[in-house]
Amino acid sequence: MQPGLWLLLATQLAALRGSSVLQQAPGSVMVQTNGMVIMSCEAKTSPTSTRIYWLRHRQAPSPDSHYECLAYWDPIKGIVYGQEVEPEKLTVFPDATRSILNLTSVKPADSGIYFCMTVGSPELTFGKGTRLSVVDVLPTNSQPTKKPTPRKKMCRPPSPVTQKGPSCGLLTLGLLVAGVLVLLVSLGVAIHLYRLKRRARLRLLKQFYK
């Protein structure tokens, strides 16, 4: 089997199960364009002289997957870069049993899954991978602004008009009193007329019988 194909198959298996020997962090990270990213890979059981390689995969694992060897740290040579890697954007340095990968001025094209790897004899050991997403605008967690619900206008009945003047009770009482007075006056007039007629009749009778 060709070494390139062997590395491809081994890395695909690493994407599925990873390794507890190499502890990689963070699991995923999202940054804005031109931002900076720091990843770490710690070898738990390997000696401090073990080389830790950094690989990148730009898309989800598939039969046509292409993995790039980015860089590794050599105690004598220092940072050893892979092909087509921009040294000004990528730095690797050791920290005891860890390897630190520092990416600067990242672009959306740098998005992908980053793996750390150690080479044994003959096995390859991989970290679980760090998924990097580079976006132009970071998503916000703020909730969308809700338009206030317009309040319904309540139709109020017109206020009763207060009429100034005497109350109904007083008005009715006044009418009754006026009616009684009219009746009394009418009765007095009728009695007076009756008396006048009676007197006139008596006078006529007296004149007739003389």
Swiss-Prot record:
Which positions does UniProt annotate with glycan attachment? N102
Coiled-coil residues: none
Tell me which positions the record assigns to the signal sequence.
1-21
Keyword flag Cell membrane: yes
An individual GO BP term: adaptive immune response
Q: How does it assemble?
A: Forms disulfide-linked heterodimers with CD8A at the cell surface. Interacts with CD3D; this interaction couples TCR-CD3 with CD8. Interacts with LCK.
GO MF term (any one): MHC class I protein binding
Q: Spell out the disulfide connections.
A: C41-C116
Q: InterPro entries, per this entry?
A: CD8B (IPR042414), Ig-like_dom (IPR007110), Ig-like_dom_sf (IPR036179), Ig-like_fold (IPR013783), Ig_sub (IPR003599), Ig_V-set (IPR013106)
Where is this protein found?
Cell membrane
What Gene3D superfamilies does the record point to?
A: Immunoglobulins (2.60.40.10)
> What role does it play?
Integral membrane glycoprotein that plays an essential role in the immune response and serves multiple functions in responses against both external and internal offenses. In T-cells, functions primarily as a coreceptor for MHC class I molecule:peptide complex. The antigens presented by class I peptides are derived from cytosolic proteins while class II derived from extracellular proteins. Interacts simultaneously with the T-cell receptor (TCR) and the MHC class I proteins presented by antigen presenting cells (APCs). In turn, recruits the Src kinase LCK to the vicinity of the TCR-CD3 complex.
What name appears for this protein in its UniProt entry? Answer: T-cell surface glycoprotein CD8 beta chain
Task: Answer whether the UniProt record assigns the keyword Lipoprotein to this protein.
Answer: yes
Occurrences of domain Ig-like V-type (ranges): 22-132
- Organism, per UniProt? Felis catus
Q: Which GO terms describe its cellular component?
A: cell surface; plasma membrane
- Transmembrane domains' residue ranges: 171-191
Side Extracellular, residues: 22-170
Q: Identify the stretch(es) annotated as Disordered.
A: 139-161
Pfam families reported for this sequence: V-set
Keywords, in A-Z order: Adaptive immunity, Cell membrane, Disulfide bond, Glycoprotein, Immunity, Immunoglobulin domain, Lipoprotein, Membrane, Palmitate, Signal, Transmembrane, Transmembrane helix
The chain's Cytoplasmic topological domains, given as residue ranges, are 192-210
Post-translational events: Phosphorylated as a consequence of T-cell activation. Palmitoylated at the cytoplasmic tail and thereby targets the heterodimer CD8A/CD8B to lipid rafts unlike CD8A homodimers.
Topology with respect to the bilayer: Single-pass type I membrane protein
